[in-house]
């Protein structure tokens, strides 16, 4: 069996620490203590790293298509490596959840998230595992774009750091147990 963990974000140092790049941050934290080296794969339009965990190949992916076209990379990789949709997890930001809130789901709509809209459009289903990290709503008078492209303030940065630790633990638990339902029960809330 092969697993694929995808973190959504935008490529380039300009976006590195933005709220919208929480998926990239999560992937970086997950692989920190694993022997994973990323390569920039132009064919798949993604940075890809892999390792074996519990005798299963696991791909860690950061699409380089920019957020709104993430589905292009996800679909190409699922197809090429013959990865089942049930073995996919997508990690991304959610502005409808308070900062640092964590929510795991096995299906659902895009909820206005363009990266998720792209994935749904390309893979043809809303039924895939996802880990959502709350980034909160924009302050009064601030646009959604400025909010998601902004960085966390110091206080929120501390909370997000702790949440990213929980994301790492959730992914490790999932890879060990091979059961997303059980992972949701343990880490939601």
Swiss-Prot record:
Keywords: Cytoplasm, Hydrolase, RNA-binding, tRNA-binding. It catalyses: an N-acyl-L-alpha-aminoacyl-tRNA + H2O = an N-acyl-L-amino acid + a tRNA + H(+). The record marks 10 as: Discriminates between blocked and unblocked aminoacyl-tRNA. The active site is at residue 20. TRNA binds at residues 15, 66, 68, 114. Its EC number is 3.1.1.29. Its main location: cytoplasm. Coiled coil: none annotated. GO terms for biological process: protein quality control for misfolded or incompletely synthesized proteins; rescue of stalled ribosome. It is found in: Cytoplasm. Pfam families: Pept_tRNA_hydro (PF01195). It is an enzyme of class 3 (hydrolase). The record marks 93 as: Stabilizes the basic form of H active site to accept a proton. The keyword Hydrolase applies. One of its GO terms (molecular function) is peptidyl-tRNA hydrolase activity. It comes from the Bacteria. PANTHER family: PEPTIDYL-TRNA HYDROLASE (PTHR17224:SF1). Hydrolyzes ribosome-free peptidyl-tRNAs (with 1 or more amino acids incorporated), which drop off the ribosome during protein synthesis, or as a result of ribosome stalling. Catalyzes the release of premature peptidyl moieties from peptidyl-tRNA molecules trapped in stalled 50S ribosomal subunits, and thus maintains levels of free tRNAs and 50S ribosomes. HAMAP family: Pept_tRNA_hydro_bact. This is Peptidyl-tRNA hydrolase. It comes from Streptococcus pyogenes serotype M49 (strain NZ131).
């Amino acid at each position: 069996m092969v697993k694929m963990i995808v973190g959504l974000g935008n490529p380039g140092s300009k976006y590195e620490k933005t709220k919208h790049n929480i998926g990239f941050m999560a992937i970086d934290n997950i692989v920190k203590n694993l022997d994973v080296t990323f390569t920039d794969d132009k064919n798949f339009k993604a940075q890809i790293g892999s390792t074996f965990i519990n005798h299963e190949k696991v791909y860690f992916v950061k699409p380089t298509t920019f957020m709104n076209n993430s589905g292009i990379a996800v679909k190409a990789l699922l197809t090429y490596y013959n990865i089942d949709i049930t073995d996919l997890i997508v990690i991304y930001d959610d502005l409808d959840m308070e900062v640092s809130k964590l929510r795991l789901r096995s299906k659902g709509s895009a909820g206005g998230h363009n990266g998720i809209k792209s994935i749904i459009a390309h893979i043809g289903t809303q039924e895939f595992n996802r880990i959502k990290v709350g980034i909160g709503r924009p302050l009064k008078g601030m646009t959604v774009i400025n909010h998601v492209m902004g960085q966390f303030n110091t206080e929120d940065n501390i909370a997000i750091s702790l949440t990213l630790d929980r994301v790492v633990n959730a992914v490790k638990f999932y890879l060990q147990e091979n059961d997303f339902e059980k992972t949701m029960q343990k880490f939601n809330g």
